[in-house]
Design a protein with these regions (language model features):
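Short, Lys/Arg-enriched N-terminal segments with co-localized hydrophobic residues
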Residues: 1-6
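Extracytoplasmic
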Residues: 237, 250-256, 266, 298-300, ...
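Non-transmembrane functional regions of envelope-associated proteins
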Residues: 8-298
Length: 330
């Protein structure tokens, strides 16, 4: 009996003695337990820790030089001082658009939404003061002729300028029900989307789902394609990830970034790659292929940003300099 007791005690002490292998086993078991407890949803506490770790890694790495293939035309304070408060009359935006096209960019992206008509258009301006002009002869004929004159319709001027080059117009999605959704109102990207799984449908995708879009007015919606520019900051206001696609009525719509990248590459299709693990009624993404380029995403189709650096890391041009032709090149 003493021998058995001694062996049992020795075995217990041996099992309790810490070793790197045992520590690894404990960590793996703890991680599995946490994953089983929380599933795909990461608690806010752990998400906050992840975000801070990522921030620290970018600060330690420092600024990375850009390729100068992306140039940002900024409607900055100097532009507002010179051309007036925003929003500008759209004949000025049309002139800015044309001057950017003249510089020869591969694609022009607008992270601006033109959801209402330009109230400064002369044709609309005179129409609002119809009562003042009521004493004039043939006022209705005059106003109709003014409305058809493209030089007096700023929205048509901007639409024609946008259509003269390769561009992507931005729009936004709303996610809360506001009872303003209209049937038949949807964006019109020129992208073809396919799935790499034959047994899946768009309705199966695990993505953000929008309630309705806020799109550009028809006179201006003349771009080569359209893409949303919604962003979703974390609790500290930092944007760590961006969605490449958002679902609307069980159809995935691409972001402004995806469409600009695709048009630069000259591709017509994006292929969504689905995970073979998990519930087939809620398929997670693993990435997106555009041409020969594979872009890895999280399960919701979000891309983790690789920050190049702080503000002004990419080349910025003042819109005022572009409009004035002050020796700037794009």
């Amino acid at each position: 009996m003493p021998g058995i007791y001694h062996m049992t005690k020795h075995l217990i002490l041996s099992l309790l003695r810490p070793t790197p292998f045992k520590a690894g086993v404990v960590c793996i078991l703890a991680a599995c337990l946490l994953w089983y407890s929380f599933g795909y949803e990461k608690p806010d506490f752990f998400s906050a820790i992840d975000a801070r770790i990522v921030d620290t890694m970018f600060r330690v790495r420092g600024v990375e030089k850009t390729t100068d293939s992306v140039v940002i035309v900024d409607i900055d304070e100097r532009s507002l001082q010179e051309y007036g408060q925003w929003p500008w009359p759209r004949n000025i935006v049309a002139e800015l658009t044309q001057k950017i096209y003249d510089a020869g960019p591969l694609v022009l992206g607008f992270d601006i939404l033109f959801a209402e008509k330009d109230r400064t258009s002369p044709a609309d301006l005179f129409n609002r003061y119809r009562s003042v002009l009521s004493g004039c002869n043939n006022i209705d004929t005059l106003l109709a002729a003014m409305k058809e004159n493209p030089e007096l319709n700023h929205d048509r001027l901007l639409g024609e300028a946008i259509a003269s080059g390769t561009s992507v117009l931005g729009y936004m999605f709303l996610f809360r029900e506001d009872f303003l959704k209209s049937s038949g109102v949807s964006p019109f990207p020129s992208l073809n989307i396919s799935l790499d799984a034959k047994d899946a449908d768009f309705s199966d995708l695990r993505m953000l789902r929008a309630y309705r879009p806020i799109i550009n007015i028809p006179e201006i919606a003349t771009a080569s394609s359209e893409g949303f520019f919604n962003v979703f900051p974390d609790q500290n206001g930092t944007v760590l990830k961006v969605p490449l696609f958002i679902m609307l009525d069980n159809i995935p719509y691409p972001s402004l970034d995806v469409e600009m990248f695709r048009l630069v590459r000259g591709d017509q299709e994006a292929r969504l790659h689905l995970s073979k693990i998990g519930d087939k009624r809620s398929r997670a993404l693993i990435g997106v292929s555009i041409g020969n380029t594979f872009i890895r995403t999280d399960d919701l189709g979000h891309l983790t940003l690789n920050f190049r650096g702080p503000y002004n890391t990419f080349p910025y041009l003042s819109a005022a300099d572009v409009l004035n032709g002050s020796g700037v090149s794009i």
